């Protein structure tokens, strides 16, 4: 099948898809969409594509002081330079052959499970890290020396000191783990058995006896999947500090009709050492509450996003009240969506001070507890702030008994403004990770979210107030593909010092800058329309915004994105012959079809077309119909007529600002003139055309005939029939082709001659019809 006919058939399929999708709105799309190739060509991504004998780059630890990113993977621990991850050190930490064979004999996959997958990577002190891995279903931990100072350049495993990793790392590499190391003590949420059924929140290491949640009690934990753990002060007294765990779990019996997943936040006191007679070596201050992330639906039925995927804490001036960002997805296999919800710690504390969930038996519903709550209130840390108890071992028996039977709160925690700040339901991906950066802009502070997806893309989103700062709308600035192949993003870290973002997946690690101001354009209006808090117009280019720069030359409007007000160069916006205007000349054949391509850089811009007849100054808006069809890629003109000759102006309209992107001059050649040029047997150019046609190979003549047939049959409704005829003829020719019966020597000679022929060929007659 010829080149042109193949392209024509492909174009027909793309055209139908484009026509169907054009009616969709542009409000929920990224303003800029950058492919992996575009990211590479613009030097906006650096990738570490992994090692042949490693994978699963899921466990991140950021060290801004040393300018290193530590990454735990399969059988390896890496130390990447934050400036450029191409510069790295590695530690090889595999399991022994004996452990691997035991894992294999237990029925596990020798490649995907019988290895040492690093699950815990925490800073132990100023000179060492603490690392734990699955150890081929035999968890193991050790220390890694990193030196006192960054210039020490030390990164080595202490292979003389290994510890049992039970209660620190899961056995199964597929299970999630949340860990936090404080004052030499490791807090971890994980599974503590080979079968992956005994889930618990542990505290190990240190000088105290290990402590955990109650075992085999679904009221405490019901098949949880741990996401993250964070230390948050409760007051100015360090004795009141609490560790909060974020996880998702199956709903408790009676809490929901049918099987459901709930997102949770759990709390424990840092100075909890268990009970004296009851709950010995068990948490006595553990409480949990449900996190709600939902949107109102018809008939009062809300759509819930219950699958908690990731959590990020944005610190504020008050360390006791960080903002909690959570990424959620739906549990349904039919309706797939993602959401980001934002929570305040004051709302969390209010719920933990509210009523406890209670029911009298298995056949009863959960209700708020109405009886007397013992003193001190269960969940309160023993300190001088809230009572005279020095230790949880001194708590009265009724407090311990109540805490054991009432670990859940009745009221849930609702997000700020009672709704998500971002929802995505009409895309082929789901959110997996989130990090947030607080950026100072000309008109205030903005939180910029970087959201990872399960297809290897990163979304850059900024929340902008509509009327007040309490009523926010999200603006999707960019969608960036950061890996060559689609892969789930499983880890993200943000370096404010380096202004870089680091992304982990099964395939490798990627690094990209937080801002790419130069890609927005070379005009003030384009920079202003981007609404990127990192960027501002400095008088000559779109560059990084610095609050300390001279205010006189800066142009930035994140809240409204209004270039008409802020840019002084807009007096030239109606000059169609400006330096940024692209001009093209296209030739079309009468009664055939042609396509005028025009795609603005911004996917949020609306395209507006005008037509200017030859030798006329007046421009008129192009009206769509059967003759002219608009797609997202441009204009399709069917059955060209001589009157279609003229200038076509493509404008992009965004936020009330119109910019001319392209001027296309269309010249329509009448059919009689073309036939005369192509088939004329007279001397001159006609003889040259005839000579060219006679010198064509049979396959080239078929291609030429297909082209003429397309010209003489411009009705695109028969395009699929035409393509089917070409494909049938091509298959028939392949079936009728004689078999090759030559010997190996003749075959080799034929290949050599063919190769020489290809090298001498100029390809002059294989060009597309337009170039001919």
UniProtKB/Swiss-Prot annotation:
UniProt-listed GO biological process terms:
axon extension; axon extension involved in axon guidance; axon guidance; axonal fasciculation; axonogenesis involved in innervation; basal dendrite arborization; branchiomotor neuron axon guidance; dendrite morphogenesis
> What InterPro entries does the record point to?
Ig-like_dom (IPR007110), Ig-like_dom_sf (IPR036179), Ig-like_fold (IPR013783), Ig_sub (IPR003599), IL-1RAcP-like_ig (IPR041416), PSI (IPR016201), Sema3A_sema (IPR042820), Semap_dom (IPR001627)
Free-text comment on this protein's domains from its UniProt entry: Strong binding to neuropilin is mediated by the carboxy third of the protein.
Q: What is this protein called?
A: Semaphorin-3A
* Gene Ontology MF, one: chemorepellent activity
State where the protein is found. Secreted
Q: Where do the segments described as Disordered lie? A: 729-772
Q: Name one GO cellular component term.
A: extracellular region
What positions does the record give for glycosylation? Answer: 53, 125, 591
Highest taxon listed in the record's lineage:
Eukaryota
Q: Name the lineage.
A: Eukaryota, Metazoa, Chordata, Craniata, Vertebrata
Mark out the compositionally biased spans (Basic residues). 729-738
């Amino acid at each position: 099948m010829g080149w042109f006919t193949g392209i024509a058939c492909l174009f027909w399929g793309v055209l139908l898809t484009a026509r169907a999708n054009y009616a969709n709105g542009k409000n929920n799309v990224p303003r800029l969409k950058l492919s992996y190739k575009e990211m590479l060509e613009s030097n906006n991504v650096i990738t570490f594509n992994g090692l042949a004998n490693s994978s699963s780059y899921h466990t991140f630890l950021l060290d801004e002081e040393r300018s290193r990113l530590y990454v735990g993977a399969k059988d390896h621990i890496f130390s990447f330079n934050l400036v450029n991850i191409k510069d790295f050190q590695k530690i090889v930490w595999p399991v022994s052959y004996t452990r691997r064979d035991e894992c294999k004999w237990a029925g596990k996959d020798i490649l995907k499970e019988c290895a040492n997958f690093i699950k815990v990577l925490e800073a132990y002190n100023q000179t060492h890290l603490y690392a734990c891995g699955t150890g081929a279903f035999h968890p193991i931990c050790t220390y890694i020396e990193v030196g006192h100072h960054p210039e020490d350049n030390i990164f080595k495993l202490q292979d003389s000191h290994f510890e049992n990793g039970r209660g620190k790392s899961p056995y199964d590499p597929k299970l999630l783990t949340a860990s936090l190391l404080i004052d030499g003590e490791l807090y971890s949420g994980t599974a503590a058995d080979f079968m992956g059924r005994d889930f618990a929140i542990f505290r190990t290491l240190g000088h105290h006896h290990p402590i955990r949640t109650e075992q085999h009690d679904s009221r405490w934990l019901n098949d949880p999947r741990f996401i993250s753990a964070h230390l948050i002060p409760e007051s100015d007294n360090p004795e009141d500090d609490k560790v909060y765990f974020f996880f998702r779990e199956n709903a408790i019996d009676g809490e929901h009709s049918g099987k459901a997943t709930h997102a949770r936040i759990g709390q424990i006191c840092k100075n909890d050492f268990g009970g004296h007679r009851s709950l010995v070596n068990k948490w006595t201050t553990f409480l949990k509450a449900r996190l709600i992330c939902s949107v109102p639906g018809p008939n009062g039925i809300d759509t819930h996003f219950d699958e908690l995927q990731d959590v990020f804490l944005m610190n504020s001036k008050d360390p006791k009240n960080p903002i909690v960002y959570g990424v959620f997805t739906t549990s349904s296999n039919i309706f797939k969506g993602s959401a980001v919800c934002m929570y305040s710690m004051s709302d969390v504390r209010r719920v933990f001070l509210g009523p406890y969930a209670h029911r009298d038996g298995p056949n009863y519903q959960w209700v708020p507890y109405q009886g007397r709550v013992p003193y001190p209130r269960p969940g309160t840390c023993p300190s001088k702030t809230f009572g005279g108890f020095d230790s949880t071992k001194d708590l009265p028996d009724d407090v311990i008994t109540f805490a054991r039977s009432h670990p859940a709160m009745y009221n849930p925690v609702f997000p700020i403004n009672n709704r998500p700040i971002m929802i995505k339901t009409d895309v082929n991906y789901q959110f997996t990770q989130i990090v947030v950066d607080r950026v100072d802009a000309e008109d205030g502070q903005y939180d910029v979210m970087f959201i990872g997806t399960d297809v290897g893309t990163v979304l850059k989103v900024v929340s902008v107030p509509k009327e007040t700062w309490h009523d926010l709308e999200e603006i999707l600035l960019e969608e960036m593909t950061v890996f060559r192949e689609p892969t789930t993003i499983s880890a993200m870290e943000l370096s404010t010092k380096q202004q870089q973002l680091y992304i982990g997946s099964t395939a490798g690690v990627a690094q990209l800058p937080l801002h790419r101001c130069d890609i927005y354009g070379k005009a003030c209006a384009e920079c202003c329309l981007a609404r990127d808090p990192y960027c501002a117009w400095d008088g000559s280019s779109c560059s990084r915004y610095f609050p300390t720069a001279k205010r006189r030359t800066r142009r930035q409007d994140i809240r409204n994105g209004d270039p008409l007000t802020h840019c002084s160069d807009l007096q030239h916006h109606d000059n169609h012959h400006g330096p940024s205007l692209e001009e093209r000349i296209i030739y079309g054949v009468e009664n055939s079809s042609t396509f005028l391509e025009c795609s603005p850089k911004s996917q949020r811009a609306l395209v507006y077309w005008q037509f200017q007849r030859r030798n006329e100054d007046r421009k008129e808006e192009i009206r769509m119909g059967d003759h002219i069809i608009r797609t997202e890629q441009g204009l399709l003109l069917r059955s060209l007529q001589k009157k279609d000759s003229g200038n076509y102006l493509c404008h992009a309209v965004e936020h009330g600002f119109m910019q001319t992107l392209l001027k296309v001059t269309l010249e329509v050649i009448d059919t009689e003139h073309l036939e005369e040029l192509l088939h004329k047997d007279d001397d001159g150019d006609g003889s040259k055309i005839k000579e060219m046609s006679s010198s064509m190979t049979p396959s080239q003549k078929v291609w030429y005939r297909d082209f003429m047939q397309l010209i003489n049959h411009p009705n695109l409704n028969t395009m699929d029939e035409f393509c089917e005829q070409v494909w049938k003829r091509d298959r028939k020719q392949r079936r009728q082709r004689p078999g090759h019966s030559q010997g190996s020597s003749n075959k080799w000679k034929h290949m050599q001659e063919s190769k020489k022929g290809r090298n001498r060929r100029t390809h002059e007659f294989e060009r597309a019809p337009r170039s001919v």
